[in-house]
Structures are given as structure tokens and as C-alpha cells.
């Protein structure tokens, strides 16, 4: 036990990052009324469009939240994830954690075009994505939180950081904790933010090793788990390359409702993604196991922490973009 505690402690001491981000907790140049005089309708416009988009397909809520997450973990929340590849810029869209999982770029384009028609050159793509993620959460039953705004869009992207900074579905707990910690996010933040998987879907390529690996061990193969596992294997064949892009809900109980069901799934040992299940069954999950149990028992506690953690993640800013950033006219390209 002492060895486990030592390893867990070392995660929090060795992996201290050296980056130029303004991490959560510092004085930040973001305010709730940043657009009060320059684009007072921006929140209403984004809300209205998100209502239509989520009504068209509830999965769009998870898509926008995921885009926001992947943006903030690379260079801070600066809209870099939205940049297309050009002759002079290598974008993040083709990085391994993004290429087969991120969508929603056309949704951002749609909202941005409307905002530009009302308030040209005022609202950043980074702010659009941050507000949209909040509204997406609410529209599928999740909590409300105030969104501070005033972010700038970066003129750069980082394929390398997208490859190294973002957690992957098959990653172990210690590595994931380190990645959140490097962004200034705590273990409590991590467990809460991963709760957004309650409305997400995953591709076969991202859960194949789990359902043909230790799923039987963690779920103890009770009759319900056996049935669930059999259905997953029908969706996702064992052979790599076969059915890789087939998808299923990460939360198979209430897949279109933002609730705490995902944590009950982990308690049963039925987590679809290894990275999720690790929070409850890993030998190093002393703290995460307790938090998962708390959120499974108390949905109010989960909602409260999720709101706080989303604000905290949204406050990860890129110092370079703050000083030399811009408001892109088209979220896919740097202004010329």
C-alpha cells in the first residue's frame, strides 16, 4: 500500500509542466460582460443555434463539448483545434487523438457565419466554442454555469501537442492524471470532466481492446453484463480493421441524457473505455474510486463540480494568443 501511495504522490510531483499558459487560478482577462457593448446578442445567437443543432441530433451536444475539451488541452482555449491544414500551417485535426474522433466543424462554421453577420470581427472562435459547450450541456439535461469571455484566437496550431497532451481511450490512470495535472486540473476536475462521456459515443477501434480484454474481469460477468458484452462484440469484431468506425454509446443506459449514469456504469465494472473504467478499478485509483462513488451517489455534487471544472478548463489560456491573438473571420483559417 505504501508503494501505491508513493507512486500516486510522484504523479503529482514529477509531472510539473513548463508552459506559457495562464492556468486556472491566476488573474485572467476574461469577464462575463466582455461583449456587452460590442455584440450583446452573442449568447442568444449561440443558444438559439445550439437548440436547433441538438434538436437535429442529440449527439451534437457531445460533439461540441468534445471539441472544446480538445481545444483547451492544446495551447489553451484558443480555437487552434478548428484550424484547417494549409501550406504554411500544420493543423491539429489529423493528430491521432483527433483524426477519427472529432467532428462538429461545420456546426462551428454555421454559428460563426451568423455571428459575423451581426457582429463582424468581434467574437472569437474560442469563445464561440466555450459558450457552445455550456449550452450543449444544458440542452441535454446538464447544469448551467456562467461563461467568462474575451479569449483570442491563435494564429498557430500544434500537431505535436495534440498528439501528446490529449488523453487516449486505452491510457492508464497515472498517465491521464498527469495530463490533466499539466493543464492545472486536479483529480477531482478529471473525474468530473470525464463524466461528459455520459452523452458520448465511441468507435470500435477505441474500445476493442477493452471488450476483448479485462471487461469480463471488472464486470464479474453477471447475467446483465454478459448480455451487454455480447451486444458490444456484435458491434465491434475482434479483428483489427474490421468495423473500426462502428459506434456505440459510452453510457448505454441514458445515452442522450446528461446525468450521473456513467458513474454507475463504472461501479458495475462495465465502463466501455479503459480510461474511464481505470478511475474505479485501477490499483492506483485510491482517490478516483472515492470520487466516482460520490458522483454515482450524489448527482448534485457531480453537476456542481462539473460546472466548476468546465469554467476552470475554459480558463486555460495561451499567453501568446492573449498578447498577439486575433478574432478569426473564418474559424478554419488565420486572418490574412
Curated annotation (Swiss-Prot):
The record marks 66 as: Transition state stabilizer. Residues 1-20 form the signal peptide. GO terms for molecular function: heme binding; lactoperoxidase activity; metal ion binding. Keywords: Biological rhythms, Calcium, Disulfide bond, Glycoprotein, Heme, Hydrogen peroxide, Iron, Metal-binding, Oxidoreductase, Peroxidase, Secreted, Signal. Glycans are attached at residue 246. It is found in: Secreted. Induction: Expressed under a diurnal rhythm. Binds 1 heme b (iron(II)-protoporphyrin IX) group per subunit. Substrate binds at residue 167. Disulfide bonds join 39-119, 72-77, 125-331, 204-236. CDD domains: secretory_peroxidase. Its cofactor is heme b; Ca(2+). Ca(2+) 2 binds at residues 198, 251, 254, 259. Heme b binds at residue 197. Removal of H(2)O(2), oxidation of toxic reductants, biosynthesis and degradation of lignin, suberization, auxin catabolism, response to environmental stresses such as wounding, pathogen attack and oxidative stress. These functions might be dependent on each isozyme/isoform in each plant tissue. Belongs to the peroxidase family. Classical plant (class III) peroxidase subfamily. This is Peroxidase 11. It comes from Arabidopsis thaliana.
Amino acid at each position: 500500500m505504501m508503494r501505491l501511495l508513493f507512486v500516486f504522490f510522484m504523479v503529482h510531483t514529477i509531472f510539473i509542466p513548463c508552459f506559457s499558459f495562464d492556468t486556472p487560478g491566476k488573474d485572467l482577462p476574461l469577464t462575463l460582460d466582455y461583449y456587452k457593448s460590442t455584440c450583446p446578442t452573442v449568447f442568444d445567437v449561440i443558444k438559439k443555434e445550439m437548440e436547433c443543432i441538438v434538436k437535429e441530433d442529440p449527439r451534437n451536444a457531445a460533439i461540441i463539448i468534445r471539441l472544446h475539451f480538445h481545444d483547451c488541452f492544446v495551447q489553451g482555449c484558443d480555437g487552434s483545434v478548428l484550424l484547417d491544414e494549409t501550406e504554411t500551417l500544420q493543423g491539429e485535426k489529423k493528430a491521432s487523438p483527433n483524426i477519427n474522433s472529432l467532428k462538429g466543424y461545420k456546426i462551428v462554421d454555421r454559428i460563426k457565419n451568423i455571428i459575423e453577420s451581426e457582429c463582424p470581427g468581434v467574437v472569437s472562435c474560442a469563445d464561440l466554442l466555450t459558450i457552445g459547450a455550456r449550452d450543449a450541456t444544458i440542452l441535454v439535461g446538464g447544469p448551467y454555469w456562467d461563461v467568462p469571455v474575451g479569449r483570442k484566437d491563435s494564429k498557430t496550431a500544434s500537431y505535436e501537442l495534440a498528439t501528446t497532451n490529449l488523453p487516449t481511450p486505452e491510457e492508464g490512470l497515472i498517465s491521464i492524471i498527469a495530463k490533466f495535472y499539466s493543464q492545472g486540473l486536479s483529480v477531482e476536475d478529471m473525474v468530473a470532466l470525464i463524466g461528459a462521456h455520459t452523452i458520448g459515443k465511441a468507435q470500435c477501434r477505441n474500445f476493442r481492446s477493452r471488450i476483448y480484454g479485462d471487461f469480463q474481469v471488472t464486470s464479474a460477468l453477471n447475467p446483465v453484463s454478459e448480455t451487454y458484452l455480447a451486444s458490444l462484440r456484435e458491434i465491434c469484431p475482434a479483428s483489427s480493421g474490421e468495423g473500426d468506425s462502428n459506434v456505440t454509446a459510452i453510457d448505454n443506459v441514458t445515452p442522450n441524457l446528461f446525468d450521473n449514469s456513467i458513474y454507475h456504469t463504472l461501479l458495475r465494472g462495465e465502463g466501455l473505455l479503459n480510461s474511464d473504467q481505470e478511475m474505479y478499478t485501477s490499483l492506483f485509483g485510491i482517490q478516483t474510486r472515492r470520487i466516482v462513488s460520490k458522483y454515482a451517489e450524489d448527482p448534485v455534487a457531480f453537476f456542481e463540480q462539473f460546472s466548476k471544472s468546465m469554467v476552470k478548463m475554459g480558463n486555460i489560456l495561451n499567453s501568446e494568443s492573449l498578447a498577439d491573438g486575433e478574432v478569426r473571420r473564418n474559424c478554419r483559417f488565420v486572418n490574412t
